[in-house]
Amino acid sequence: MARKWNGRAVARALVLATLWLAVSGRPLAQQSQSVSDEDPLFLYGWGKITRLQYLYSAGPYVSNCFLRIRSDGSVDCEEDQNERNLLEFRAVALKTIAIKDVSSVRYLCMSADGKIYGLIRYSEEDCTFREEMDCLGYNQYRSMKHHLHIIFIQAKPREQLQDQKPSNFIPVFHRSFFETGDQLRSKMFSLPLESDSMDPFRMVEDVDHLVKSPSFQK
């Protein structure tokens, strides 16, 4: 009896550890793995994947707000999370992403002088950024073509931005990401434990309809 109970405890602990890793981590552009377009982004790997996030601006110029790409192509910042500043991120190459505003359906792009703006059509040269992380854990974005970091600033003319520090950002998950994790945990604890099975919570057969990747619309 004790041996059977220990088997159940081990199985439950393994499943809980897997779920914790899946829903608690913030994606970091540090490692690479091959993932299909349909798979959700759960850990730190990069592939051809899409994720829904807000981009929180943490300074040093504009701070305490969320980046938004307006329908007229301008880029500004809003204090609250809402449908207007929800962004889609897609990894188009190793540690390289495209960013698209869900509401305005415009891609974040950069001109030769470092100005950021929104385009309806994706341009591989102007709308592709390398996602980097500094020593303090902030995300920074550098244009692959122009070799300039995004400097999110509204007060100074663009010609005065040379040698300025990059803007710091924190990607914030959309609440649906955590709701999916809650659904998965709730379903797991409602299932009878089958200690003799390789899938004691029957998660493999049911997980597909619970976890879905957000679509990256063209």
From Swiss-Prot:
SMART domains: FGF
Family per record: Belongs to the heparin-binding growth factors family.
Protein keywords: Growth factor, Secreted, Signal
Stretches assigned to coiled coil: none
Residues in the signal sequence: 1-25
Summary of the tissues where the protein is detected: Expressed in the developing brain.
Primary site of residence: secreted
Function: Involved in the suppression of bile acid biosynthesis through down-regulation of CYP7A1 expression.
Keyword Secreted: yes
Family matches, as InterPro entries: FGF15/19/21, Fibroblast_GF_fam, IL1/FGF
Pfam families xref list: FGF (PF00167)
Oligomer status and interactors: Interacts with MALRD1.
GO molecular function terms listed in the Swiss-Prot or TrEMBL record: fibroblast growth factor receptor binding; growth factor activity
A cellular component annotation (GO) from this entry: extracellular region
Location of the protein in the cell: Secreted
Protein name (record): Fibroblast growth factor 15
Biological processes, Gene Ontology terms: bile acid and bile salt transport; fibroblast growth factor receptor signaling pathway; heart development; negative regulation of bile acid biosynthetic process; negative regulation of gene expression; neural crest cell migration; positive regulation of cell population proliferation; positive regulation of D-glucose import
